[in-house]
Regions:
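Short N-terminal helix/helix-N-cap motif within the alpha/beta-hydrolase-1
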Residues: 92-95, 121, 194
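Residues immediately flanking
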Residues: 114-116, 186, 210
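Conserved small/polar residues in nucleotide/adenosyl-binding loops
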Residues: 205-212
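Phosphate-binding beta-loop-alpha motif at adenosine-nucleotide cofactor sites
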Residues: 83-89, 155-199
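Generic structural signal for well-ordered alpha-helices
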Residues: 67-71, 97, 169
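Short, surface-exposed, charged loop/turn segments at secondary-structure junctions
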Residues: 126-127, 199-201
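PAPS-dependent sulfotransferase catalytic core
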Residues: 1-87, 102-112, 116-154, 176
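Short, surface-exposed basic-aromatic patches at helix termini and helix-loop junctions that form
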Residues: 100-103, 201
């Protein structure tokens, strides 16, 4: 059973899609064909089976019901040094870091962070664009966020809360340590995507760029 050895865990609207595509071009990197599997954000039993809960409307419905199904995402890997996936909800969903470490011990995590206000507004515009957000006023959506969270609205509506990076990073540092957790900024990704990608390649123990492999 082939499993990933690294994860792009967030944050949403912070450049994770661009980084996914950059990494996917590297011959020593295999990325899951589904960019966002939404697997480790779900609770699992002792056998790696997703625990379904009817009240969890705030979570993305599971694409895979157990660890064996999830591993099929990586069965086409052919000796690449780095095997990964990118689900930006992972940094925010409670318990995800611990589940990754339990089922994929020693894996590395990559985080992209964006100015929280810019990130929140970008997430709001995205939710409006796809028809998920019923409001058109961002300020009103922020005012209603605490009530939405209490009513277990989907994580996509947690605009302000998903930008509270301290607690999110704290969990990952506690689980992964500094040696297995890399943090970059969205602004750096925009200004120098190749430079950020090269530093990520170094974290993943690959050569700096495709032409060097």
């Amino acid at each position: 059973m082939t499993m990933p050895n690294f994860f792009i865990v967030g944050a949403q609207k912070a450049g994770t899609t661009s980084l996914y595509h950059y990494l996917n071009q590297h011959p020593q990197v295999y990325m899951s064909p589904i960019k966002e599997p939404f697997f480790f954000d779900h609770e699992m039993d002792s056998k790696g089976r997703v625990v379904r809960r009817e009240f969890e409307g705030h979570r993305q419905p599971p694409r895979f019901t157990n660890i064996e199904e999830y591993s099929t995402l990586f069965e086409a890997a052919r000796g690449e040094k780095a095997i990964g996936e990118a689900t930006p909800l992972y940094i925010y969903a409670p318990g995800t870091a611990e589940r990754i470490e339990r089922y994929v011990p020693g894996a590395k995590s990559i985080v992209l962070l964006r100015n929280p206000a810019d990130r929140a507004y970008s997430a709001f515009l995205y939710a409006v664009r796809i028809g998920a957000e019923p409001l058109t006023d961002f300020a009103q959506a922020l005012r209603e966020e605490p009530l939405r969270i209490r009513n277990r609205w989907h994580y996509i509506f947690h605009y302000r809360s998903r930008g509270l990076y301290y607690q999110q990073l704290k969990r990952y540092y506690e689980v992964f340590g500094r040696e297995r957790l890399g943090v970059w900024l969205y602004e750096d990704m925009r200004e120098d995507p190749a430079g950020v990608a090269q530093s990520v390649f170094c974290l993943l123990y690959t050569s700096p760029s495709p032409r060097d492999s």
